[in-house]
């Protein structure tokens, strides 16, 4: 059985996420405690107690990434106990999730990755400050139609770009919120079932984040290891394994669209099963891209379900 590990991005946060792993897995608990000490973020409070910080990008990003890494730590602990070998053929993350994937691949210490995505969230927010940035999801419209509308808009001075290629019939565009809103009718006239502004104050994966990409390199360079297991880049939908590639691709990731569906299609032949850590968002998207099964490890019950499958198919 060949596995691929996948990691979700921003938007899947919820109060209480990771609690079962923290309370029942020693490695997961140690991970959270060490991350809190290293970053200065009170992750127990951030993840487990109601509050506004969980929806602020500079805290949302490390919270989601930590939850993913705790789920992975809990799986590795149980797999070792049950003498199961569950090593990925490749790793892939959606947006923020590429950093989780890189850490899980051995490219960065988890605590350093969490500090980095905390900074990444702050840089993204700062780059969009005062620019009226936003994002919009377009449903049931072909990629080419979305791209043409965006290209026509940018040629007339608007700031609108395709940002996330999630699956056929679901694409997210980013740019100035007013420009996005002005195009809502055009997307629908072209055949979109829905064109809805998202509750976002940043415009991810588009040229509005150019300054954030430049600054991110300064923090990324000392944190990266020289080589690691294959990680599929959001910006190219191709795998990379070295620090020099990571520096180029993670900077590009901020200003380039997330090629998620292209990544799954390019590499699904190398895996029999996808395993998502910390949320069940990509599981739903994968159903529209591939016939290969996807398991989402979000709590002890879903961990048990995956381990049962892995034992039956070893």
Regions found by a protein language model. Give the residues of each.
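A structural micro-motif
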Residues: 41, 86, 158-160, 193, ...
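A short, acidic, amphipathic alpha-helical segment used as a generic capping/interface helix at domain edges
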Residues: 255-272
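Alpha/beta catalytic cores of group-transfer enzymes, especially the acyltransferase/condensing modules
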Residues: 11-12, 105-254
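NAD(P)-dependent dehydrogenase/reductase Rossmann-like domain
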Residues: 218-219, 297-314
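Glycine-rich phosphate/pyrophosphate-binding beta-alpha loops
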Residues: 60-62, 202-204, 257, 261
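Alpha-helical scaffold elements within enzyme catalytic domains, especially in hydrolases
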Residues: 20, 34, 186-189, 266
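FabD-like malonyl-/acyl-CoA
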Residues: 1-146, 274-305
């Amino acid at each position: 059985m060949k596995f691929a590990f996948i990691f979700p991005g921003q938007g899947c946060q919820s109060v209480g996420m990771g609690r079962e792993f923290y309370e029942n897995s020693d490695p997961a608990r140690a991970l959270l405690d060490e991350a809190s000490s290293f970053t200065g973020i009170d992750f127990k409070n951030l993840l487990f107690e109601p509050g506004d910080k969980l929806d602020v990008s500079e805290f949302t990003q490390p919270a989601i990434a930590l939850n993913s890494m705790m789920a992975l730590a809990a799986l590795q602990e149980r797999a070792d106990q049950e003498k199961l070998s569950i090593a990925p053929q490749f790793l892939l993350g959606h947006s923020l999730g590429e950093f989780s994937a890189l850490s899980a691949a051995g490219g960065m210490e988890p605590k350093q990755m969490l500090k980095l995505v905390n900074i990444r969230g702050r840089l993204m927010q700062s780059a969009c400050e005062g620019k009226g940035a936003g994002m919009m999801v377009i449903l049931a419209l072909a990629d080419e139609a979305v791209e043409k509308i965006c290209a026509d808009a940018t040629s007339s001075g608007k700031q609108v770009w395709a940002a996330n290629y999630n699956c056929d019939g679901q694409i997210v565009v980013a740019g100035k919120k007013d420009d996005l809103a002005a195009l809502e009718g055009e997307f629908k006239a072209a055949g979109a079932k829905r064109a809805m502004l998202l509750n976002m104050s940043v415009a991810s994966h588009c040229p509005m984040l150019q300054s954030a990409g430049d600054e991110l390199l300064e923090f990324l360079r000392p944190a990266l290891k020289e080589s690691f297991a294959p990680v599929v880049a959001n910006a190219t939908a191709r795998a990379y394994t070295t620090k020099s590639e990571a520096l180029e691709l993670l900077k590009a990731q901020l200003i380039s669209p997330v090629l998620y569906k292209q990544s799954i299609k390019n590499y699904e032949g190398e895996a029999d099963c996808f395993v998502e850590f910390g949320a069940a968002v990509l599981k739903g998207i994968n159903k529209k891209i591939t016939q290969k099964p996807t398991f989402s490890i979000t709590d002890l019950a879903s961990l048990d379900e995956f381990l049962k499958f892995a034992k039956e198919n070893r």
